[in-house]
Amino acid sequence: RIDSEVLATIFYAEPARAIGINSIRGDFGALFLAMSLFTLVGSFGSQRWLLIPSVFLVLVIVGRMTSFILDDLPMVLASSLVMELIFLIVLVLALISNYLKSDSTENRSFFRVFFNQRMLIALGTVLVLIMGAFWGHEKIGIGLWNRAVEQRTNQNTIARLSDGLHVGLAGTGAPIPDTKRVGVSTFVIAGSSLFVVDTGPGSTRKLELMQVPLGRIDAVLLTHFHSDHIGDLGELMLKAWTTGARTKPLHVIGPVGVDRVVYGFNQAYALDSDYRTLHHGPTVADSRGAGGVSQSIDLKDKASTAIVFQNADLKVSAFLVDHRPVSSAFGYRFDYKGRSVVISGDTLPDEALRREAQNVDLLLHEVLNPEMLLTMNRAAARSGRNVVRNVTHDILDYHTFPEEAARIARDANARHLVFHHFIPPVPMAILHRAFLGNSRQYFDGPITMGVEGMLFSLPAHSNAIEKGWLLQ
């Protein structure tokens, strides 16, 4: 199933928040320009379809004003709102004019539906409510804050998950700046065990917003040491310590070199850790739990795998993938009570990945669309941005294209393919089909464009793959 929130987020429209209403308008700005022209043309006509832009503009204006109240976005209010109100007034006057001069009984009956006592009372009520919201916004704000805090404190979706494998997307972006996505990070829950795979910039905050209990993390698994995969490690170590009152450092597992990475973050956060202990005391910030402790996995060749965690029901394996010139880059496989997940890490199409993903339920694969990236490359060349031109050329040779990932999923007999770590950014849902290219020609199973907040649940000893949503 796909919850309405998941579907809305795929289209970058968040129905539970006012900013979602504005995001539709922003993402489809051309539609609004067309609507403005439609409004002007329509004001000189006598057609019933004048009601369409009228209703549409009312929704836009309400969305803009609601955003101002709830999301503190005055910058979207001023000039655009004035123009929209002018267009709306012109339309309403045109409608009234058409009604007054209409000789048709049918037309008069049609317009009478919208211009009657009940409709005017309803409109007046809405206006009073909007005005009241502006005048009483302080008391309303305090009330909403108190209610939100109560709901947030008592809500614990993670604790109510059924037994099985649960995979959450806390970050699906890549190094290229993206207004919609943060650095790549995925959490995996298997029974009582919790793992975080990679900690891209900004992902710790997403984990917190998804109410992942950071203090319970068993281990952080790093695929490799590019900055977009480790940038938030220090923040994650700090938050796991202070929000969970840990008395042991966070366990960080990765390829050879992880010792240097963890040591560096420990040093960078050492003074902060001292301050926390002095301020909060050992009950909250016991110095024994600060920072991280590393475990290095040395895989010699593609034929090898390493078991990095195992108990009676769960096995977590690491395997080498091809992300040269990175000397050691890992993918990870999780097997729990008949369910399985593979996270590719950054890689070219790779036989080891194809082997390790055999019959997997869920394959999370990084992805790069070459045509879109080359468009950026050519634009950078034309504008003289040589660094961007060089980078967008160089990264073509160590990532996987959508069609290649689809073939891997097909050859491995994967049941569901999820794309993340998008290069270049995909700012609008309307671009999804173009980004996927011909992927669906090679893999006939479900393909999902990952979004922060998505949760994939694989109940133990079943075939179900359920989609949920963890961002409020």
Where do the PLM segments sit?
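Aromatic-anchored segments of alpha-helical transmembrane domains
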Residues: 56-66
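Core segments of alpha-helical transmembrane spans in multipass integral membrane proteins
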Residues: 19-40, 55
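Non-cytosolic membrane-interface motifs at loop->transmembrane helix junctions
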Residues: 73-84
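Membrane-interfacial loop-to-transmembrane alpha-helix junctions, especially the N-terminal start
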Residues: 46-56
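Membrane-water interface at the C-terminal end of transmembrane alpha helices
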Residues: 87-104
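Hydrophobic transmembrane helix segments
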Residues: 1-18
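Binuclear metal-dependent hydrolase catalytic cores
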Residues: 103-341, 430-463, 471
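Cap/insert and terminal regions of metallo-dependent hydrolase folds
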Residues: 107-133, 331, 340-342, 348-452
